Design a protein with these regions (language model features):
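Short, well-ordered coil/turn segments that N-cap beta-strands
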Residues: 20-22, 49-51, 83-89, 151-156, ...
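Aromatic-lined substrate-binding rim segments of carbohydrate-active enzymes
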Residues: 40-47, 51-119, 146, 245-253, ...
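N-terminal carbohydrate-binding accessory modules
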Residues: 1-54, 65, 80-84, 88, ...
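The substrate-binding groove and active-site-proximal loops of carbohydrate-active enzymes
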Residues: 23-35, 56-73, 120-139, 164-169, ...
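Carbohydrate-binding surfaces of carbohydrate-active enzymes
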Residues: 210-213, 244, 252, 285-678
Length: 678
């Protein structure tokens, strides 16, 4: 195996995270098991090839069983055992959930929900991010852990808390209200500026002094949307501040890199990870298939591409996933044979250089006892365990891909701020959601075999042939000008409805929709005209659409397709215009998936985009990782039939030579070191 190229620069004196090849890891919770099980654990880890273990994630009550008491006996022994067996440690700070004695002595640290009720201990994350009492106790524990293990040879990485903000991101107590007011003072300076930003002349909400402002708890009616989005921003910043406080403590005692596990997965939207990503020494993400979605497998690819975007195109760590079923969905589906491997390598294809799981050994008790694990309740004579061992061997075969990355010609813009604002309480229709529109856009490109980067509205767009902007409801003047400049200089863009509508304060841009993008697109919309969820309209192209139409007028743009029925027959539904040396498209409705794919094919071809893989229903994924000297083609076949892909080189999974055509069996993954680097 070859030592990994440094994947991300450590900050504030930290070293870079390096590893021999692709890390294969897990959450390891030995405190749940008798000590005689630990020796078997490390033997099995070595058999499977597991070489990175996250420990002490929920260790707080073990390290501090009572006030003033510390017990590091178990953690000492586990660290030494792992190190002796060549297993590196991703060491948790132990602060993710407070011990019962702390919430008993200080119930004021407990989070308060938007209805004003206190959330009790007994689950996890029973703390408010703004609680000064919790911070004092948590940082004191971090100090002890960092001082004791800051130079332990097993520690490869620090793991701050766990899934920050998963349950407690939005807290509505008095400590939070005070911190929110401080954040608002820093943002606006004067109460007059805040009133202007929040539009408080509406509904007699004008504030006279800072003390009058609280958290946006539930009201008798809908809440002020400008206050709500600022509270989302504040809450993300407040948890980021907490993360920084833990990092400051760790830096005093250790130069090991520091991270925390993001949750770029399905519906979770509590934190703005564009602001978080620069703060971690390497981006790490937890991802779980969510079967409440129409297409969980395509969402996995989207999440992996978004995580790579957060990492700035550099390598990142898949910190958690499952071998099979989870425990927290209404219907927790097991994975089919081979699916765990396909999921894992889909992440690797999109830039991951660690494949880790929750958890090592399935728990006997607790809320997650039916969550799958590397070692299931039934033990090692199981299909799951055999696939785990095979996956470890496969990752070893792929070690040489480390240091390469993914290059895409197409970017899709994504914004947590726009998500928060677009899905507010008061919007034209609740049948349309931001994430659905983003996922649909991505799926259409994915099914065309087109590789995609997910980027922020502030990203450098100069390297892309096509930029797609799905439902970017909230956009700043600078971001709008940034996209217009990209098109002016020869880029191609596709903007979809409900984009550019408001500024950063959720203030509607006057003069007609789509506000910030009106001039770029050569159109104006005088009125939204949403449809009932069971209604459809037909376009003169033959396409079917639903959920949304607009009273649109072209102002220089060409009408590519018009409605032939519905509330606005004859009105343009798709437009195209030249802008500078580039082209800007606009989609004013929700096309059915096949029609959206057809539109994306037309737009991408016009932009000069060449698909890497074949068109499919998402069952075949083709992704290339490369650098200046090497090129690797990943082909992931989720389908029930064998597929053939043009390729030549050395196939790494099976160790065979590919002359001109790669055959990938149903349900399999193949990775070819291509003969000719790009």
């Amino acid at each position: 195996m070859t030592a990994r190229t440094a994947v991300q620069q450590g900050s504030h004196g930290a070293t870079r995270f390096t590893h021999e090849g692709i890390a294969f890891g897990c959450d390891y919770n030995p405190e749940q098991w008798a000590s005689e099980v630990w020796q078997e654990d490390v033997q099995l880890m070595r058999k499977a090839g597991v070489d990175l273990a996250a420990i002490n994630i929920f260790g707080g009550s073990h390290l501090e069983p009572q006030p003033g008491q510390s017990d590091f006996t178990t953690l000492d022994a586990v660290l030494d055992l792992l190190h002796a067996n060549g297993i590196r440690v991703n060491l948790g700070t132990g602060t993710s959930s407070p011990p019962p004695w702390l919430t008993t002595l200080h119930p004021e640290i407990l989070p308060v929900a938007q209805d004003g009720t206190t959330r009790n201990p007994g689950g996890r994350q029973a703390w408010c991010p703004s609680s000064p009492v919790f911070r004092v106790h948590a940082l004191a524990l971090v100090e002890k852990v960092a001082e004791r293990y800051g130079h332990h040879p097993a520690v490869a990485l620090w793991h701050v808390s766990n899934e920050l903000g998963c349950h407690n991101a939005l807290c509505y107590d008095e400590d939070t209200a005070a911190a929110f007011r401080g954040w608002l003072r820093a943002r606006y300076g004067t109460i007059e500026a805040l009133n202007a930003a929040w539009g408080t002349s509406f509904w007699s909400q004008q504030y006279g002094q800072w003390a009058e402002i609280g958290t946006p708890m539930l009201t008798l009616s809908t809440r002020n949307p400008s206050q709500v989005i600022d509270f989302h921003r504040f809450s993300s910043d407040e948890l980021l501040d907490y993360y920084r406080r833990e990092v400051e403590v760790l830096r005093r005692h250790s130069t090991a890199p520091v991270t925390t596990n993001f949750m770029v997965t399905a519906h979770i939207r509590n934190l703005d990870y564009w602001t978080w990503a620069p703060e971690v020494d390497i981006v790490a993400n937890d991802h779980y298939l969510d079967h409440r979605l129409a297409d969980p497998t395509t969402e996995l690819s989207f999440a992996a591409d978004l995580t790579r975007g957060l990492a700035g195109g550099n390598a990142w760590l898949l910190m958690e996933q499952s071998t099979g079923a989870v425990n927290w969905q209404p219907y927790n589906l097991a994975k089919a044979p081979g699916q765990m491997t396909r999921n894992s390598l889909a992440h690797v294809a999109r830039g991951a250089e660690a494949v880790c799981f929750f958890q090592w050994r399935a728990s006997q008790q607790g809320s997650e006892k039916f969550h799958s694990a590397l070692v299931p309740h039934a033990g090692t004579d199981t299909e799951v365990w055999r696939e785990v061992v095979d996956l470890g061997a496969t990752l070893d075969h792929l070690d040489e891909i480390v240091g390469t990355t993914v290059v895409a010609d197409v970017a899709v813009m994504f914004s947590w701020e726009s998500w928060w604002a677009a899905d507010g309480e008061s919007r034209p229709t609740h049948a349309v959601s931001y994430l659905d529109r983003v996922h649909a856009t991505y799926a259409a490109l994915h099914e065309l075999g087109i590789t995609v980067d997910i980027v922020s509205p502030d990203a450098d767009l100069s390297g892309y042939r096509l930029v797609v902007v799905p439902g970017l409801y909230l956009v700043s003047d600078a971001q709008a000008a940034h996209l217009a400049d990209y098109v002016e200089r020869g880029g191609h863009a596709l903007v979809t409805f409900f984009s550019g509508i408001v500024d950063e304060d959720d203030r509607v841009r006057l003069g007609g929709y789509p506000g910030a993008f009106r001039d770029l697109l050569g159109i104006t919309v005088e009125e939204f005209s949403p449809l009932q969820p069971d209604h459809t309209v037909t376009l003169d192209s033959g396409a079917t659409a639903s959920l949304w139409t607009e009273r649109l007028h072209t102002c220089g743009a060409e009408a590519v397709a018009r409605y032939v029925d519905g509330p606005l027959p004859g009105t343009a539904a798709i437009t195209r215009t030249s802008h500078g040396t580039g082209v800007a498209w606009y989609l004013a409705t929700v096309l059915e998936p096949g029609a959206l794919r057809d539109l994306m094919r037309t737009v991408s071809r016009g932009a000069g985009v060449t698909p890497l893989g074949p068109e499919s229903d998402g069952t075949v994924e083709v992704v290339r990782r490369a650098d200046a000297d090497r090129s690797y083609l990943f082909v992931i076949n989720h389908g029930s039939c064998d597929v053939s892909i043009p390729a030549a080189g050395h196939e790494l999974v099976c160790g065979t030579t590919v002359e001109s055509t790669l055959c990938v069996p149903a349900g399999a993954v193949r990775v070819v070191r291509e003969d000719t680097a790009p």
